[in-house]
Amino acid sequence: ITRENLKQFDGIFFYTTGMLLPDGDPREALMDFIKAGKGFVGTHSAADTFKKYQGYVSMINGSFAGHPWGGGSTNGFLNHEPNHPTVAMLGKEFIWKDEIYQYNNFDPNAVRVLFSLDMAKSKPQMPYHVPVCWVRNFGKGRVFFTNLGHNGSTWDNETYHKHLIEGFKWSLKLTDGPAEPNPELQAKESIKAFALFASQKMKLDHDKLLKDMMTKAGDEKFIKLLRENSWKSKGRDMNLIKAVLTELK
């Protein structure tokens, strides 16, 4: 990748891993390419690429932090934007067999999450929200990322082909679809994951807990605590879970 070579392209696709490019201008050239109005599409391990280069991590908005949902697992997904061209082919809810990442360095205020794990239909169940596909504006450019793409069966699936092709088209500005961040939706998804986990582990009334927690969906301090503690707990440290519940009293 060089600045001169990039001039011939309108977009770039990453299904990659590792550091790829040397320090300095090649990396900056890639970021400037997108910011200038070009398209970026990343699948699966694109979020396990350039993990030590903050410019890329910030652009894609996440870095690999494990995959509790391995390639042999079949999980449920919630499509939050069924009218968005990049995910319209998937329906409001769907089941898929693939390896699903969880992420460090994910900023809910930076991206529009299009679909997420449905913890009620996934194993293991974790107390935190796991985004799977998102879009964003990056400078004048567009970024589309989907975590799907580990399994060969995914690449053989015609629905996935449509998903990816529409991602390319959207990133190249050939179709329209919103990219404004949706942190409010993500906060509610965080609450839903936590309430499901806590009610099962601590034998609480799920519906009441969910209702009580939803009253605090707009409380930034509470949502920050919820996200931090649920992530740090890894579904094991119940003291961190209890600390969140204490804030409801």
Regions found by a protein language model. Give the residues of each.
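Structural detector of well-ordered beta-strand residues that form the stable sheet scaffold
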Residues: G39-V41, L114, F144
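Catalytic beta-strand/loop cores that center a nucleophilic Ser/Cys/Thr
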Residues: G62, H67-K140
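A glycine-rich, often tryptophan-bearing local segment used as a flexible ligand/cofactor-contacting loop or short
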Residues: F14, M19-M89
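Extracellular ligand-binding/catalytic regions of CAZymes and related secreted enzymes
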Residues: K121-V130, N137-L209, T215, I223-K224
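Alpha-helical adaptor scaffolds
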Residues: L225-L248
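Solvent-exposed, acidic/flexible segments
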Residues: M19-R27, N157, H161, K234-M238
